[in-house]
Amino acid sequence: MSKIGKRAILLLLALPIGFNVMAQETKKPTLEELIPGGESYRYADNLYGLQWWGDECIKPGVDTLYSIQPKTGKETMVITREQINKVLEENKAGKLSHLYSVSFPWADKPQMLFKIAGKFIVYDFKSNQVVSTLKPKDGADNEDYCAASGNVAYTIGNNLYVNEKAVTNEPEGIVCGQTVHRNEFGINKGTFWSPKGNLLAFYRMDESMVTQYPLVDITARVGEVNNVRYPMAGMTSHQVKVGIYNPATGKSIYLNAGDPTDRYFTNISWSPDEKSLYLIEVNRDQNHAKLCQYNAETGEPMGVLYEEMHPKYVEPQNAIVFLPWDPTKFIYQSQRDGYNHLYLFDANAANMKGETYNSANGGTYFQAGKVKQLTKGNWLVSDVLGFNTKRKEIIFTAVEGLRSGHFAVNVSNGKISQPFENCKESEHSGMLNASGTYLIDRYSTKDQPRIINLVDTKNFKETANLLTAESPYEGYQMPSIETGTIKAADGTTDLHYRLMKPANFDPAKKYPVIVYVYGGPHAQCVTGGWQNGARGWDTYMAGKGYIMFTIDNRGSSNRGLAFENATFRRLGIEEGKDQVKGVEFLKSLSYVDSERIGVHGWSFGGHMTTALMLRYPEIFKVGVAGGPVIDWGYYEVMYGERYMDTPESNPEGYKEC
């Protein structure tokens, strides 16, 4: 055969492959592929259930459990599901369908904990035997297993139980052992075991005085009415007490905190010796927080260790944490210098004389004893991961804007492992081992959906890469993403934006724009993580030919207290002004069709969508508001009054917003 003939055959053989690649590269992801819950949703690879057993990393799978040495990354098989199920069947304890839900709460014991058919099972994976089983009563909810004592707290209906014993017997309208204050102030549970498991602190919420509102279920053939107690801004709120239950005696006491009317109790924690219970009390106006100590045996107050006041609001969200090597010292998180940072406190300060000082954030604070600020800078501590006792260090995660990373601060000399400025744009979370020497670092970047590394906390360098996930949309036609900053309506503050352009973008064309907005507290839409925080819906609409634009206005999170509380008593107003600045930026772009700009958002974003449509009808041609807050007077007491005060004290603000 001639060379020309061979070349022709090779070309023909290559054509289908080339056509197939071209077809794949021009394929746009569907809504089902982009939205979680879709039947064909494409997600990045992950390692589920990754955790520590003491200082060994545990990697579960469906059928096999592996341990990973953090220094080398070497994997060793620990046990198989088949081995466990054989023993479980012999004990008539059921079967595990996978190993992802297994946990290792005992750092010094070869034991794991899992749950089958409502039973908590402790299993020794060295001797291959069931150590213990514990089954709460039927209907159990809010389960809280204590690894130190082997007891489990839970609720049935509105009452609290420990093991099989009822701790409370309250009528309808009084709820025990569940979250209170509408899950504000960092509250996400209602029971708190002491370090050794000898005592259980719990919430008791009396909401019998709160107005009931009917929710009608129309999905049934005959409609049903379910009443919910919902305290709206300015109205009567529920009253909370904190109890302490002793499983050994079966008796409970309640803290003698005084009249609970218009007071919030949050951030509950124990002293290492279980003799004291600590909590942070916030007043109804939410402008005064007090760290209080109580006697765990009698419930009597032992003193106030710290107070923080601000003319706008204070919002404590983290319980104190004691140093594992010194039970007389604890870590307190505060925004008193304008950013959330770590402070070292003396636990004996309740008996000391204190003074009041002016804080850098515009408020004041009262403290007794010696207090040392451990972290400082125009960035925030977002999570305390734990301690390295040998090096006397606190390991934590920090964030500011699009950058985040892990750090260590030495409690003795205040030295931090690296400057925050070394952080790159990314989104990190971490899990520390028992000794604080290594951590599991999960993070993403704009172009990388997920990376999981084991990291040495001595220098925060990777020792083993466990996963580098590829984009689940490799080969698809994807939009391009740009980020940058513009000035807020105050003319000085930088705001981060994300601009998503359709694939095959043509700068000579005019494109319609959808502004996706949230804009409220405790949320950041533009991040340094995967696709800069863009959602699948954004990608889908970009595929339909829209430019997608998002800006984090003042009032959103991870930029410091002044950035967040700039919207105080005027929710939606200042945020709206910043969103308009974003639109002005859009209109400066030659490829934006300024006559076709829409806005969309959910929840607080629904409120923003409605407000923008009504206040700036000349800008936005269409708006879609999902679950919007239309009138802040109908929102809950805790959230609404923090940012707006009461309708009685701020009538013009409520009317304007």
Kindly give the residue locations of the regions a language model identified:
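Serine-hydrolase catalytic core recognition
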Residues: 212, 274, 428-657
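Beta-propeller folds
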Residues: 21-417, 437-438, 446-448
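Extended, charged, solvent-exposed helical/coil segments
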Residues: 385, 421, 429-432
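C-terminal outer-membrane/trafficking sorting elements
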Residues: 3, 19-22
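Active-site donor-binding loop signature of nucleotide-sugar glycosyltransferases
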Residues: 36, 80-81, 135-136, 169, ...
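Bacterial N-terminal signal peptides
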Residues: 9-18
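Bacterial N-terminal signal peptides that target proteins for export
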Residues: 1-9
